Amino acid sequence: MGLFNAHAVAQQRADRIATLLQSFADGQLDTAVGEAPAPGYERLYDSLRALQRQLREQRAELQQVESLEAGLAEMSRQHEAGWIDQTIPAERLEGRAARIAKGVNELVAAHIAVKMKVVSVVTAYGQGNFEPLMDRLPGKKAQITEAIDGVRERLRGAAEATSAQLATAAYNARIKSALDNVSANVMIADNDLNIIYMNRTVSEMLGRAEADIRKQLPNFDAGRLMGANIDVFHKNPAHQRHLLANLTGVHKAELNLGGRRFSLDVVPVFNDANERLGSAVQWTDRTEEHRAEQEVSQLVQAAAAGDFSKRVEEAGKEGFFLRLAKDLNSLVDTADRGLRDVSRMLGALAQGDLTQRIEADYQGTFGQLKDFSNDTAQSLSRMLGQIREAADTINTAASEIASGNAELSARTEQQASSLEETASSMEELTSTVKLNAENARQANSLAANASEVATQGGTVVQKVVSTMSSINESARKIADIIGVIDGIAFQTNILALNAAVEAARAGEQGRGFAVVAGEVRTLAQRSAAAAKEIKTLISDSVDKVENGNTLVAQAGQTMSDIVVAIRRVTDIMSEIAAASAEQSTGIEEVNSAVSQMDDMTQQNAALVEEAAAAAEAMQEQAGLLNQSVAVFRLDTPPSVVQLASARPSAPRPSAPAPLARSGMARASKARKEDGWEEF
């Protein structure tokens, strides 16, 4: 009877423990564990309380994951709206959620996706599986791992201690039932590494992966794993056997089988006597998770290299991974479209095309980048348009200046040519006037001699007959000289007329020259009149000489008349000599004025040449500026700028007929030798 009561009490206590575990499995973590019902159960109940605390912490961590999902969704929406500097508030998260948020934030900082490692235990906790082994956490979090390990050890020890009792059997049955129904993939092996337990989830998982595992392990059969050795998962199991034999804590491993990637959390199982009973393994199929990690990693690496064409494959994903893929793709797509638009516009600017604009609708930082880029292109287009119009204006002005300089150069050349011809004519006129003065001086001397002879004629009248022939010859010579003087006066008159014409052509500058030419003409006319009078007198003298032989008797009576006439001739010849001297002085002054005008014309020609060179240089610079600006395409064609001349250019006067004088030819040759070919 006492034994029966003991079994009943043990059964009741086992039921209590199983009820607590079932409530934990159902998510009822606020159920009070209570105190140990009897000595020996303290460690077990302490472990249950530690397990309850651990599960509460796991639930809190699940809430952190939900906060992470909310932050990621908000970041995705903000990125879709263009605010690419939005990040997940990692400072509000803890543990793995904070690390994932930090990785995503690094992706956001570089406008790329960040590699995000999603741990399989988070998914298992979300599904209500409380059996997976915890990672070896640092710092104070290591107490959580130790508490869970202690629970596993004490549960196994309690099961072995009560294996002979019905309560223990019931307890084990309930434990097994709980493990069978949890979502975690649990496998237990004994010390010989033979598989002694597999829950339904791990069997189903390995069954789904059987075809892939056989690619690497052809003899693998998921339906015959119970009782088999775990060596079936390894081609060379010696290393794994040694590792498990010396295992004292949680061991994490990654197993790749036929393209499948499994995460293994292995923990040794001890009884209350600290005897090794075997090992428990939590399997997690991380194939999809690993594939997602690889895709995110490739996306990050491509974006870091400037390639935004990569995307995370959305097909075949669901839940969190699907949302993550969509959000990352949306993020990269927004960055890609924005950078492509900016690249297209900058490429067009580099090619000189200022008509390109960013038309797509962006917000946030990309919106500002769009506005700044469009404003920059608009400002450049407006500035280059103004430069192009200014260059056209300068080019037109330079062309008109060059044209005006060409006309001015031609006129200056004609003026220089006329002045050179005038100078040549004045040289000849000066030479003629000097010759005329010399002849007048000689005539004056002859007239003086004739007067002296006439004065002595009274005393030598007896010699008149003998010298009549000589007088007749002298009279003929005088007549010839007077003819020459008459011709000189006529030529002087013609030259004075030509000088007046040239002075009229010179305009205002030739006014003084015209006055001098008029005086010369007056003197020439007076010389001509005097020459005519002398010619008349000489003709009369010749007639008288011819009649001298018959009038010798009358010579004495008319001698006084001859003396008076000869004195008159002497006076006239003196006047002719004085007029010739004045004429020579006037011609020299005219020649000096013409020389000064020629010098001024040459200086003007030099200034015109410099102005023409400056205008050509300005026109050339304007052309270069037009060529530089012409490579740019603007929104609107530049307006044509024309400068109206201040006055219509005067027609170029026809060049005067060249004078056939050797002096003109010599002057022209001298100009060419001095480098004045343009004038």
From Swiss-Prot:
Where does the Methyl-accepting transducer domain start and stop, copy by copy? 390-619
Basic and acidic residues bias: where? Answer: 670-679
Upregulating conditions = Expression is regulated by the sigma factor RpoS.
The entry's stated outcome for Y197A is: Signal-off mutant that does not respond to either O(2) or CO
Q: Where in the cell is it found?
A: Cytoplasm
What region holds the PAS domain? 171-213
Q: Where is this region: Disordered?
A: 405-425, 644-679
Swapping F233A leads to an effect described as:
Signal-off mutant that does not respond to either O(2) or CO
Q: Which UniProt keywords apply?
A: Cytoplasm, Heme, Iron, Metal-binding, Methylation, Repeat, Transducer
Annotated region (Divergent domain HAMP 2) at 63-112
Q: What is the effect of changing I213C?
A: Signal-off mutant that does not respond to either O(2) or CO
Q: What's a GO biological-process term for it? A: signal transduction
Name the reported effect of I195 to A/C. Answer: Signal-off mutant that does not respond to either O(2) or CO
Locate the site labelled Important for gas binding and signaling. L264
Transmembrane segments annotated in the record for this chain:
none
The free-text domain remark for this protein reads:
Contains five HAMP domains, three at the N-terminus and two at the C-terminus, separated by a PAS-sensing domain. The PAS domain binds penta-coordinated b-type heme and is likely responsible for sensing the gases. Binding of oxygen induces conformational changes in the PAS-heme domain. The N-terminal HAMP domains facilitate the O(2)-dependent shift of PAS to the signal-on conformation. Signals propagate from the PAS domain to the C-terminal HAMP domains via a conserved DxT motif. PAS and HAMP domains do not directly interact but are arranged in a linear fashion.
Name of the protein in question: Methyl-accepting chemotaxis protein McpB
Tell me which species this is from.
Answer: Pseudomonas aeruginosa (strain ATCC 15692 / DSM 22644 / CIP 104116 / JCM 14847 / LMG 12228 / 1C / PRS 101 / PAO1)
